[in-house]
Design a protein with these regions (language model features):
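Class I SAM-dependent methyltransferase Rossmann-like catalytic core
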Residues: 24-63
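Conserved class I S-adenosyl-L-methionine
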Residues: 66-75
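A short glycine-rich, Lys/Arg-flanked "PGG" loop and its adjoining helix->strand segment in the class I
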Residues: 169-181
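Conserved beta-strand signature within the Rossmann-like core of class I S-adenosyl-L-methionine
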Residues: 181-191
Length: 266
């Protein structure tokens, strides 16, 4: 996967017979949960098709062998459904969603139920930080999630800027441990959120938001392959593609930024 592919690859279209969105019901559920628990939801509407396609680039431009994919923060399943459409027999998809209402919607999703034969699917209704504590459940022997599972691709929909810097670092470190050597990670952030957070939530939360953004920029400097701005999304967003060299590395030492770094990331 190259920077050029991520930045300039034309938006692919979802097949006409299966849209990433399941209609107004998903949007209403998403909005209701956003109003109830915005910190964990992080948006008022699911991602649009253009952003979904940017996030699944490592799967649509993939090696010719079975792959294992982890999706974290699936919401109502717009990315999950796209993954289910493009995965092939022998592939495995492990979906992690902490919101019980979203998890229940995913369990009943007809697109996921109609995935290709031979595509393993597992749903974990927990936070990704607690994934190792989840009890094993009987089911399809092709289901992913065995102890020590490492993934070729992780697609993260978590709203990092709603979390503390310590939480974000812990999650990113976990992603590095969960990725196979050379595995790829995608995530996204909305544009213009730093100024908006300062104006709407005050200077203290604005400072926390900026620190999380700086942490993400360090992570991208260490592992980033490219980024892509998606204007056809509400709100506009930027998708990031990263690759793990394998294993944990101290990519973001715990220290204060220099004045030059502070200006560069504000």
């Amino acid at each position: 996967m190259t920077n050029e592919q991520l930045r300039h690859r034309p938006d692919s279209r979802t097949p006409q017979d299966s849209s990433p969105s399941q209609g107004g019901g998903d949007h209403l559920l998403f909005l209701a949960e956003a109003l109830r628990t915005f910190r964990d939801t992080g948006a008022l509407a699911p991602s649009g098709t253009a952003l979904v396609n940017a996030l699944v680039v490592p799967v649509t431009s993939r090696p010719d062998r079975p792959i294992s994919v982890l999706e974290v923060g699936a919401g109502t399943g717009v990315v999950t459904r796209r993954l289910a459409q493009v995965l092939r027999p022998g592939d495995r998809l492990h979906v992690v969603e902490a919101n019980p209402r979203f998890a229940e919607r995913l369990r009943e999703d007809p697109v996921l139920a109609a995935r290709r034969p031979g595509v393993g699917l597992r749903l974990s209704a927990c936070r990704v930080e607690r994934l190792s504590e989840e009890p094993e459940e009987p089911g399809d022997p092709q289901e992913p999630g065995e102890p020590g599972e490492r993934y070729d691709v992780i697609v993260s929909g978590l709203p990092f800027t709603n979390f503390t810097p310590a939480q974000v670092r812990d999650i990113l470190d976990l992603y590095l441990r969960l990725l196979a050597p050379g595995g790829e990670l995608t995530y996204f952030g909305y544009l213009g959120t730093t100024a908006a957070r300062t104006l709407t939530s005050g200077p203290r939360r604005g400072a926390r938001h900026r620190e999380v953004v700086r942490l993400l920029r360090r992570f991208e400097a260490a592992y980033g392959l490219g980024e892509r701005t998606v204007w056809r999304n509400l709100p506009p967003a930027r998708a990031y593609l990263l690759r793990s060299p394998g294993g944990h590395e101290d990519w973001a030492p715990r220290r204060e930024l220099t004045p030059h770094e502070e200006r560069a990331t504000a």
